[in-house]
Amino acid sequence: MEIRILYKAVGRPWQEASIANTLGAMQATVGGYIETARIAKNAVVVCNEEGLIRGLPYNCRVMGTDFVGDIFVAGTKGDEFVDVPVSLGDWQRYWIGGGQ
């Protein structure tokens, strides 16, 4: 089963994507072990847990937190990852102020 995410690679704009709802697919997307940062009741940013110690390049700021390496936003329902609860357009307008 796949989930819909909002994905941002370093130096690239945000884009909509789908990934398999598996740990392996999530790790491949961020390039290592995953760590989550809750940004809403039903959404998290997923990043590389070792990004800072590995010296990954700066990516962007989301909700006042700076992220390094490739990241994605997914929805959550309880302990499960689900489709991201916002569209790319809404994300850019209201959450990150124009896609930075």
Located regions from the model:
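Domain-length accessory/inserted modules outside core catalytic folds
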Residues: 1-100
